[in-house]
Amino acid sequence: MKLNKLTIAVAAVILVAVYFCMNRLTQSPGRDNSILENAPAQESESRAGDTPDARQTQQASDAHGTRNDVAAALPQGKVRIRIGLPKPTFGGTPREIKGANNLEPPRDGKPYPPIIVPEGCGTLLSLECKVTSSDPDPILGELSYITDGEKEWDSAAYVELAPGTQWVQIDLGQEREIHGVCVWHNFYEPRVYRDVVCQVSNDPDFIDDIVTVFNNDHDNSSKLGVGKDKEYIETNEGRPFPVNAVKGRYVRFYSRGNTANEMNHYIEIEIYGR
């Protein structure tokens, strides 16, 4: 009888030991497998910021301050000039724009088309270049503001020139090949600047060797020739336009007042090329 009890006790111990061993053998792989199975899921979650939707969101965020982050593929050997935009600033009650009968069609919030140029032809050439003017003593501001790289609107950071047809001229320092231009007048409120003309030359007096690359003076009121370009409402986008590889050292901009007042204003001019 004692032997039977001892045998039973030993058997019970063996059974308990076998039970625990079997339990560990069945549960341990399960735990290991669950870690391995969860690892890809966790890795996937950690990469959630690299999904196509997230990349598009990041691209949209990156493009908030630029005009030219467009997803369309470009021809080989072509690049898009990336023009940084200042924040929009429309102050006060918008004035009625009168007498603007040559306006470009409404863009309904769409940006201007990007300026596409050959590789190596989209360098900003005008930064901190010397600026001269038909009004050498501006009413407000300094001529150097026009190429200082500061495009944000500020009541003390733009240039105001006298009424009538006035010009500002940028000296690029040497002959350059120009492929694109963007000009910002005063975009504090919607307005149209009259007779906006851009010319390029190697002659600092603009008597000879003149190429007109933009002209919206439709009635020749500034005596620079009749232009085929359209007037436009000033916004924080400025007015970008392509230039067909015109060579010259000097770039001159004309204007003749605006629909808000008789003055001529400039915040920044950017010239791109090589």
Predicted stretch roles:
Residues 115-150:
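Predominantly extracellular/luminal regions of secreted and cell-surface proteins
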Residues 72-97, 134-136, 159-166, 188-274:
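Trp- and acidic/polar-enriched beta-sheet ligand-binding modules for extracellular glycan
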Residues 131, 177-188, 253:
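A short beta-strand element within beta-rich, extracytoplasmic domains
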Residues 165-169, 177-180:
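Intrinsic-disorder/low-complexity, polar/charged segments enriched in Ser/Thr/Lys/Arg/Asp/Glu/Gln
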Residues 172-174, 201:
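A short glycine/threonine-centered beta-strand motif
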